[in-house]
């Protein structure tokens, strides 16, 4: 992101609302457990070592925000299954990126498990920021530009052309 950019005009940024839902460790640990197939309250509690009241409030919040679904079990309506929704599955790359960041920069205990591609049996690559054509981008190659509400595919700004977006980026950097 090279030269400093004025970001005061980004009140509509979605990062604060995402952090409101997922911005504390138990939420991501519950997400990780759900990715690993855990579905029931007791199993989340046993796996994570989380207090019942905290687990209960986090599950309620994750259901309210559409990250998990809450479904009574057919065989016993008193028992509930919590499963990832499409919205929750959309958080998996963020969870993996946070884990990879922690593995690289944290001084905690080393990870004892790898995330592996089932087909190839190889560890996944590091999460990266990719260009539209698949190139890995560095921080100095990125630039925030204003985009009309609800349109974040890059085509909405600058008439949909790469030239228009480059021009907007140059303008944002130069002030």
Task: Report residues per predicted region.
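Beta-hairpin "wing" of winged helix-turn-helix
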Residues: 63-78
């Amino acid at each position: 992101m090279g030269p400093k950019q004025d970001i005061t005009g980004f009140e509509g940024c979605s990062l604060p609302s995402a952090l409101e839902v997922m911005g504390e460790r138990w939420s991501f640990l519950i997400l990780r457990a759900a990715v690993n197939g855990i579905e029931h309250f007791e199993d989340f509690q046993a796996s994570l070592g989380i207090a019942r009241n905290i687990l209960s409030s986090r599950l309620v919040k994750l259901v309210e925000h559409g990250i998990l679904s809450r479904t009574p079990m057919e065989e016993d309506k008193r028992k509930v299954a919590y499963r990832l929704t499409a919205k929750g599955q959309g958080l998996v790359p963020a969870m993996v990126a946070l884990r990879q960041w922690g593995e690289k920069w944290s001084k905690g205990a080393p990870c004892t498990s790898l995330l592996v591609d089932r087909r190839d049996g190889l560890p996944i690559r590091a999460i990266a920021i990719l260009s539209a054509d698949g190139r890995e981008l560095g921080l100095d190659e990125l630039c925030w530009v204003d985009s009309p509400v609800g349109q974040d595919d890059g085509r909405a700004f600058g008439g949909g052309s790469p030239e228009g977006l480059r021009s907007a980026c140059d303008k944002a950097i130069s002030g």
